[in-house]
Amino acid sequence: MMHFKSGLELTELQNMTVPEDDNISNDSNDFTEVENGQINSKFISDRESRRSLTNSHLEKKKCDEYIPGTTSLGMSVFNLSNAIMGSGILGLAFALANTGILLFLVLLTSVTLLSIYSINLLLICSKETGCMVYEKLGEQVFGTTGKFVIFGATSLQNTGAMLSYLFIVKNELPSAIKFLMGKEETFSAWYVDGRVLVVIVTFGIILPLCLLKNLGYLGYTSGFSLSCMVFFLIVVIYKKFQIPCIVPELNSTISANSTNADTCTPKYVTFNSKTVYALPTIAFAFVCHPSVLPIYSELKDRSQKKMQMVSNISFFAMFVMYFLTAIFGYLTFYDNVQSDLLHKYQSKDDILILTVRLAVIVAVILTVPVLFFTVRSSLFELAKKTKFNLCRHTVVTCILLVVINLLVIFIPSMKDIFGVVGVTSANMLIFILPSSLYLKITDQDGDKGTQRIWAALFLGLGVLFSLVSIPLVIYDWACSSSSDEGH
C-alpha cells in the first residue's frame, strides 16, 4: 500500500472538519435536528466536534476551522490509486496460480466491490461525526479503545507494507548487483547477500531519510512508485510473449508422467495448501483506508458523493491493473510462479528486466520512509508526545528500524507477510472497523434498518474471514518447510 503523502500527518489534520455535503440541507436522515446551534448527538462530545457540525459549520464563510480542499477530482483519483497500489501486486500471480483463473477473478471482483462498500461506510461515519482523522473517528465512536484499535490496525498494515518493501530489496538487489558485476546468479559473496544488503540500505539510506523532521519531497515519491508499477505491468505483459513455458526437471514433487501440456496448461479452479494465501494477499493489495480521509479532506468542493466517485474510479483502475499483472504473470510461469513475481524473472543479459528491477528497488526504498513517518507520527500522537524532541525522535526511529530489519531477515517468504497482514490488519480495515463504526453510529436510527442489516452482514463476513483464514495460515506454517514456495 503506497500512501498518499504518507497520508497527512495526524497533527496536521486535527483541525480539519467535514464540509457541507451535496444534500446536507435536504436529507433529514443525515443529521439530527439542530437546536440552539448545536447538534443533539451522543458522538459530539467535545467543542471541536460540536463546531464542525453546527449552524456555523453550515455557513462556510463564518467557520474559521473549515479548510476548503484544493485538489481536483482527477488528482484525487491519482492520489487514491497511489494509496491502493503497493507490493501486493507482486503476489497476485502467486495467488492466481493457487486458486485458478476463474476463482481468482471471483475473489478479486468480490474484494474490489467490498472495499468500495467499506469506504462508503467510512465516509458516512466521517460525515455523521465530523471527524476527518481515522483515529479521532474511532475515539469519537468507541472511546479510547476505538482509538487504540484503529491505531493498531493502521500501524500493522503500514508495518506490513514496509516489511514487504524491504523484502523486495532483500530479494532483488543481489540479482541487480550480480548483473552489474557480470556475475552469474549462482555467485555467492557477503556483499551480494540479501540479508546484509537490506541492513546496509536501511541504515545507509532509509535511516537518514526517516530522521528528517518533515516529509518534504518524500511525500511525492508515491507518484514515482505508481509509475514504476505501471512499467512493471508493461514488462510482465511483454515478457509473456518472449519467455517460453519451461518444464522443470523431474523431482520428488513432480510425477514422472508430467508433460509439457500439463505444466503449461492454465487451471481455472484449483485448491491446495497455498490457496489460503489468495484472499489475504488480495485484501492486502486493496487496503488504502487510512489514506481515504486525508484525501477526502483535500478534495476540492468535497462531498460524500464526489469522494465515492473518486474511490469507484480508483478501485476500477487498480482492479484492471491487478488482474492484468496476475494473469500475464501466471501465463508466463504457470505453477512455477513465486510469491514475489519480479524475483522469478532472470536479469541475466536482459537490460529490460534489470531496469524494472532497479526502478522498483528505488521506488520501495523511497516509499519506506513515507510509511515510517505515518507509523511514528501515530505512535507519538497516541502517546501525546507531539512536540518534537530530537533524542526521542532518533531513539524511536532506530528501535523501529532494527525490529523491522530483524523481521525482514527471518521471514522466509513474501507470502507470509501477505498472509499475516491480510488476515489481521487488512481484514480489520476493510471489513470489521468500517462496519462496526457504522453500526455504532446508527444504533438508534430506526430509518436505516436495511443499511444496518447489510453492514451487520459485512461485519459477519469479516469475522468469518478471520476465523477461517488465521487457523489455515497457521496450519500451513506447521505443515510446510520455511523455504517451501508451494510447488
Curated annotation (Swiss-Prot):
Q: How is its activity regulated?
A: Inhibited by alpha-(methylamino)isobutyric acid (MeAIB). Inhibited by lithium, potassium, choline ions, N-methylglucamine. The pH dependence has an allosteric effect on the transport.
Chain ranges on the Extracellular side, renumbered to this chain = 98-112, 169-188, 238-275, 334-350, 415-416, 474-487
Q: Which residues are glycosylated?
A: N251, N257
The cellular component terms of Gene Ontology attached to this UniProt record, alphabetical and capped at eight, are:
axon; basolateral plasma membrane; external side of apical plasma membrane; extracellular exosome; membrane; neuronal cell body; plasma membrane
The catalytic activity, as recorded, is: L-glutamine(in) + Na(+)(in) = L-glutamine(out) + Na(+)(out); L-alanine(in) + Na(+)(in) = L-alanine(out) + Na(+)(out); L-asparagine(in) + Na(+)(in) = L-asparagine(out) + Na(+)(out); L-histidine(in) + Na(+)(in) = L-histidine(out) + Na(+)(out)
Positions carrying Phosphoserine are: S6, S25, S28, S49, S52, S56
| Membrane topology reported for the UniProt record | Multi-pass membrane protein
Record GO biological process: amino acid import; amino acid transmembrane transport; amino acid transport; female pregnancy; gamma-aminobutyric acid biosynthetic process; glutamine transport; L-alpha-amino acid transmembrane transport; L-glutamine import across plasma membrane
* Record has Zinc as a keyword: no
Q: In which tissues is it expressed?
A: Expressed in the cerebral cortex by pyramidal and GABAergic neurons, astrocytes and other non-neuronal cells (at protein level). Expressed in placenta, heart, lung, skeletal muscle, spleen, stomach and testis. Highly expressed in cytotrophoblast cells from term placenta.
Q: Which residues lie on this side of the membrane: Cytoplasmic?
A: 1-74, 134-147, 212-216, 297-312, 372-393, 438-452
At the top level of its lineage, which domain of life is listed?
Eukaryota
Q: What coarse category fits the chief subcellular location reported for this protein?
A: membrane
**Transmembrane segments annotated in the record for this chain:** 75-97, 113-133, 148-168, 189-211, 217-237, 276-296, 313-333, 351-371, 394-414, 417-437, 453-473
Q: Name one Pfam family in it.
A: Aa_trans
Induction entry: Down-regulated by bacterial lipopolysaccharides (LPS) in glial cells. Down-regulated upon hypoxia.
Report the record's disulfide bonds.
C245-C264
Q: Give UniProt keywords alphabetically.
A: Amino-acid transport, Cell membrane, Disulfide bond, Glycoprotein, Ion transport, Membrane, Phosphoprotein, Sodium, Sodium transport, Symport, Transmembrane, Transmembrane helix, Transport
Q: Name one GO molecular function term.
A: proline:sodium symporter activity
Which residues are modified to Phosphothreonine?
T11, T54
Which InterPro entries does the record associate with it? AA_transpt_TM
Output the PTM entry: N-glycosylation plays an important role in the L-glutamine transport.
Which compartments does it reside in?
Cell membrane
The record's family statement is: Belongs to the amino acid/polyamine transporter 2 family.
* Function description: Symporter that cotransports short-chain neutral amino acids and sodium ions from the extraccellular to the intracellular side of the cell membrane. The transport is elctrogenic, pH dependent and driven by the Na(+) electrochemical gradient. Participates in the astroglia-derived glutamine transport into GABAergic interneurons for neurotransmitter GABA de novo synthesis. May also contributes to amino acid transport in placental trophoblasts. Also regulates synaptic plasticity.
Q: What is this protein called?
A: Sodium-coupled neutral amino acid symporter 1
